[in-house]
Each structure stands twice: as C-alpha cells, then as structure tokens.
A protein has these predicted regions:
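Acidic (Asp/Glu)-rich catalytic clusters
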Residues: 88-91, 116, 131-135, 139, ...
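Hydrophobic faces of well-ordered beta-strands that scaffold small-molecule active sites
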Residues: 47, 97-99, 121-123, 139-141, ...
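Secreted/processed peptides and extracellular or luminal domains of membrane proteins
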Residues: 61, 65-68, 271, 290, ...
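Radical SAM enzyme [4Fe-4S]-AdoMet core and its adjacent flexible, acidic
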Residues: 1-7, 71, 142, 148-290, ...
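Radical SAM enzyme core and accessory elements
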Residues: 1-41, 284-322
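Conserved alpha-helical substructure of the radical SAM core
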Residues: 12-133, 318-322
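Conserved phosphate-donor/acceptor-positioning beta-strand/loop module used by diverse small-molecule
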Residues: 55, 141-143
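Short cysteine clusters
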Residues: 55, 59-62, 265-268, 284, ...
Length: 322
C-alpha cells in the first residue's frame, strides 16, 4: 500500500492562515478595547439572557432558583429571534451577551441561533453537558471549591465528570468560575493549583451575593472578603497566567471601594438582562431581590474598571512593565 507523502505546502498554508486569524482576532479585540477607552461602555453594549428556566442541578447558592419559575413559559426561539432583530434595528451595539439560566445547555439551540447577533459570547454552564465547538465563545464553567466543598455547594458525584469534560476540550476557551462562600473560602489556592493547568481561559472569582430566599450564612463578611482578595492578589503574582482578573477589579471589590461601585453600578445603568420569558429582569441578571450593597458579582466591578481611563492606563502600564 502506497503511503501519501505529507503536503508540506498545504501545511504551511494552513499554519499561515491560522496565524493570520489569530492576528485578526487580536486586532479586533484591541480595536474594541480602544473604543471602550475613548468612548466608554455604550448603553446596551452588553447584557445577559436567561436561556431557560430548567436545570439538571439545584445548587445551594443559585440566585436563579431563589425565585419560583414553575409557571413561567419560556419564550420560543422564533420570538427570541424577533426580539434580537428588534434590538439590532434599535442600533444596540450588541458587543457581548452572557448566556445564563437555568442551565443554558439544556436549550443550546437558542444559543446556536442567538450568538450570531453578538460580536462576543460568554456561556455560563455547570459543565455536565457536552460543549459545542462554537467560534468566538468563552465558556465559563462553575466550579465552586475543590471536590468536597463543591459536593456541598452543588452536587456530589459530578466533580470528576466536569473535570474530564474540561480536559477533553483543550481547543475551547474555558474559564473556571468559583463563588467564594463560607463553604468555599478555604479552597482558593488548592483550586488554582488543580484547575489552573487545564483551564485555558484561567480562573475568576466571585463572592456570594445575598439574595432573598437564599441562605444568608453563605455570605462572607467584609473583613473576610478583604482577606481573600489579598490572597487572590498574592496568588496572581505566583500564578500570573492563571487568575484572569485585573488587579484594579479586585481592589474595587474591597470593603472601602465596593459601595461606590455598586451605588453607580455600570451593569444596572448600561446593560440589559432578559429572563427566560424575554422580559426585563430588573436591575441586573440576579434580579431585583439581590442585595446590591453586598454584591460579590465580578461583573459590575470589571465594568467599573473598564469605564475608568485611569484604571485602564494603570493596568496597561503594569502589563507593559511585566
């Protein structure tokens, strides 16, 4: 049997094309960041869509199921298309959509259609289901603590399954997201060591936000939150390519700065948040029952960083110096 010699020219051509595509993506990212720096975050440039009111888990700290969704009728895909078309016609910038829920992958057909309306897409999933190879998508997989803490927060017996799912998709831009609570607060460094090598998109941390109907005991008081932020900043120096958060964002989450950010929440003022019925959720993706004064969601603090020219210049100088 004759063996075909490898087509060297073809391989060089493919490698060249991949390199050009990478440069193009970096250029587009730089262009978008420059626009944000010059003009600020446009209204409705970013937002969240609850894909579904269904989920295969019931996690201890889930803000979504703190509310009753049993009698909700999910908006059909056809109606979602009409809604997204109307948003586009109204000249919404459509820069980034975060697809949440519920478990978004229960209804991945909606994301498959809807993601084409946005330049960038983030899908927040529990990671128990298969992950499609969609371009221009960041996958955020919720891993709240190391295995024992995770079992208490989410469900026993699925931690290793999710880990294998991440390992089997090295081609995807997967971030690990951990919510720090009274159960997971001692897991930070172990989580970074375990998941850092396999999460291409790095690790991000949130703090539990009290929501009506959820266990108040999960919340970490301000001194503990400040201590953990200092620990994360220390670990960032030790694992610079692993923790995917700006220093300025972490500093804004501290007790002496957080209220100024949440009182002027960029998400509440500029983003959209739509529920499974297609209706507006209120002040943010967590709904109107979230305690904004104790918000631990990284999103408004990250948006506040991006909206500040001073902080963005500070981050740029820091990056150039490193």
């Amino acid at each position: 049997m004759q063996t075909r010699a490898p087509n060297v020219e073809s391989n060089v051509y493919l490698t060249h094309n991949v390199h050009l595509m990478s440069i193009r993506r970096q250029f587009i990212k730089l262009r978008d960041i420059t626009k944000l720096f010059v003009f600020g975050i446009p209204k409705f440039a970013i937002g969240s869509i609850d894909v579904t009111n269904r989920c295969n888990l019931r996690c201890e700290h889930c803000y979504f199921f703190a509310e009753d969704h049993n009698n909700e009728r999910e908006l059909s895909i056809e109606k979602w298309i009409e809604k997204l078309d109307a948003m586009k016609a109204a000249v919404h910038p459509m820069m980034l959509c975060t697809w949440v829920g519920g478990e978004p992958m229960v209804r991945k057909q909606l994301i498959e259609v809807g993601r084409s309306y946005f330049k960038h897409n983030t899908i927040v999933t529990n990671g128990t289901m298969d992950l499609p190879d969609w371009p221009n998508c960041t996958w955020v997989i919720s891993i709240d603590g190391t295995e024992d803490a995770f079992a208490r927060m989410r469900a026993p017996g699925i931690y290793q399954k999710i880990k294998q799912n991440v390992i089997s998709h090295p081609e995807l831009n997967i971030q690990i997201s951990c919510v720090l609570t009274s159960i997971t607060r001692d897991c930070v460094e172990d989580l970074v060591r375990e998941w850092g090598p396999i999460a291409r998109g790095g690790i991000i941390f949130d703090f539990f936000t009290p929501v009506t109907g959820l266990d108040e005991a999960l919340w970490l008081d301000w001194p503990e939150r400040d201590r953990l932020i200092d620990e994360i900043l220390r670990l960032k120096k030790q694992y610079p390519a692993t923790i995917n958060m700006l220093d300025s964002t972490l500093e804004l989450m501290k007790s002496d700065k957080a209220k100024k950010v949440t009182d002027n929440c960029e998400f509440r003022l500029k983003a959209f948040a739509l529920g499974p019925t297609g209706e507006d959720k209120g002040k943010c993706m967590m709904g109107n029952n979230a305690d904004c004064d104790r918000c631990g969601c990284v999103v408004p603090f990250h948006m506040a960083t991006i909206a500040s020219r001073r902080l963005m210049l500070k981050e740029a100088v820091k990056r150039l110096a490193s």
